[in-house]
Amino acid sequence: SGFGKCSLTVALPILSAAGIETSALPTAILSTHTGGISGYTYRDLTEDMRPVMKHWKSLDIKFDAIYTGFLGSFEQFFDAFRQEDNLILVDPVMGDNGELYTVFTREFAAGMRMLCQKADIIVPNLTEAALLLDEPYHPGPYTHAYIESLLRKLGALGPQKVVLTGVYFKEDE
């Protein structure tokens, strides 16, 4: 996103401060983040990614980890750069507050579910969890039993670890 405190503008400084060397491959360009700002522009960069990936492969570049956020499509980046010992972390950015972002379709959510099967770690918010599981969104507050059920079902998709964001519990729990 060109404007807004999200995406690469937030992730890269944090990763750098942690001493992690990064290589960025933008998957899309948005004029602003999608949360609460209407009229944003969006361009999928999948076609632009292919020559970058081809060049990186020709250089025999290896990655210790692959971290995805907002994706325009499901280009097979993981398959091209997956190694036995690298970590795959997927933030399945698709929606918030019970709503799928307008640039995405339900079919996109199904594709994201398949991508999460290849991940070691997934980091969905509660909207994205509902979309990944093809279940209705529950706005909360949440019970421990409900969150544990979501975590089990998300784990059954295939990742080794699931970090669920946006969770808050009833005051009496």
What is the meaning of each model-derived region?
Residues 2-102:
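Conserved N-terminal subdomain of the carbohydrate kinase-like
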Residues 102-173:
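Conserved phosphate/ATP/ADP-binding segment of small-molecule kinases
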